[in-house]
Amino acid sequence: MDDDVAALVVDNGSGMCKAGFAGDDAPRAVFPSIVGRPRHQGVMVGMGQKDSYVGDEAQSKRGILTLKYPVEHGIVTNWDDMEKIWHHTFYNELRIAPEENPLLLTEAPLNPKANREKMTQIMFETFNSPAMYVAIQAVLSLYASGRTTGIVLDSGDGVSHTVPIYEGYALPHAILRLDLAGRDQTDYLMKILTERGYSFTTTAEREIVRDIKEKLCYVALDFEQEMSTAASSSSLEKSYELPDGQVITIGNERFRCPESLFQPSFLGMESTGVHETTYNSIMKCDIDIRKDLYANTVLSGGTTMFPGIADRMQKEITALAPSTMKIKIIAPPERKYSVWIGGSILASLSTFQQMWISKQEYDESGPSIVHRKCF
């Protein structure tokens, strides 16, 4: 690869797409992973109507569009719409020619083989990529924290995973997936705010609730104690101004919402909480490496951004683990983007330059090359 051409790094999440250039310390473009199509033809007079909208534009015109999320639970399920998102990323957001820049894409842990091949095929055949690579999201987050061994709890908008990693390689037999993430938290907050007498139902109002969640929610260290504090005083109450000027007050909802990460039964789910899932993941690993995993538990993704989450994880995992075990939860301040940052670091390493799948290798071997070169 030419050294003077910047590699592109694109992290496709269920909720947001993060894109930018290797070597940068943050993504240049962050936009919702949505594609919208007009519900009725010819509604918008004189708008020069397009047949589809992507990202922020789809979000702002959502009143007249049908919105689709091509990435569900971290996995691409709709390739036509995914192609639109990639096209938008290259041409509208980054404004580069994809045929000139090597590209690092990210994938969910346990991404099906056929999916990795399809991604590879689209990049080489539709976008004429000169070189590309597919990396596992959680592994990149671990790199971003300066480690090669540890366990990552990666929780985004659509899915959470616990991924044990040893010497840079994810251990597939011990990866656990939890379909409990940011979107569920937002829905749950909508539900409990409705119980307080505030009605939030439309997709537009859901965005408001997401904002309330991001600004005001936190994880309680001791849920029962926090509930009694909230019942006996108004010290935990905060107010929030809605776009129409109405002010609402929110109290115990602030910590009841993210509590569902630790008690999924709140959402009517039977799964284990994030703390227990992390512990179960560690227990599926070889006994000799567990110590390293307990001492290097890294939080990653937007849903781990709640204040108080690291202390609570520390408390819960300490209760589950052997009593002499040293437990350390690492919560980097930039963890919302740590997958992307890890990709930026990886793609700019000199030692990584021989790892790219080149167009020539793809032409010789076909899409299955991805399993041999990206692992």
Curated annotation (Swiss-Prot):
List localization entries. Answer: Cytoplasm, Cytoskeleton
Residues annotated as coiled-coil are none
Pfam families (UniProt xref): Actin
Checking CDD domains in the record gives: ASKHA_NBD_actin (cd10224)
User: What EC identifiers does the entry list?
Assistant: 3.6.4.-
Quote the function comment for this protein.
Answer: Actins are highly conserved proteins that are involved in various types of cell motility and are ubiquitously expressed in all eukaryotic cells.
Q: What is this protein called?
A: Actin, cytoplasmic
Please give the organism. Branchiostoma lanceolatum (Common lancelet)
Lineage, top ranks: Eukaryota, Metazoa, Chordata, Cephalochordata, Leptocardii
